[in-house]
A protein has these predicted regions:
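Ribonuclease/tRNase effector modules and their secretory precursors
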Residues: 1-71
Length: 71
């Protein structure tokens, strides 16, 4: 998973954002484009904090973390 610069603006490290987004406990699609869409994901980081993340997912499986903050 790649990480956009904007994903760390709320003080969440790349490692914690990736961990929470990679092991979500809840996922909701934000778009319905079959080629590329955004997903809202809730998951715990490496410090057991619940994070809200937004990931852009491409149809080829590529993922880009664009948002991460404490939920």
């Amino acid at each position: 998973m790649r990480v956009a610069d904007a994903a760390t603006k709320h003080g969440i490290s790349e490692e914690d954002g990736i961990y929470a987004a990679s092991f979500p406990i809840w996922v909701a699609p934000l778009d319905d484009d079959p080629a590329q869409w955004r997903e809202l994901r809730l998951g715990f980081d490496t410090h057991a904090r619940l994070l809200e993340t937004v990931v852009v997912v491409a149809s080829d499986g590529d993922e880009l973390l664009i948002h991460a903050m404490k939920a």
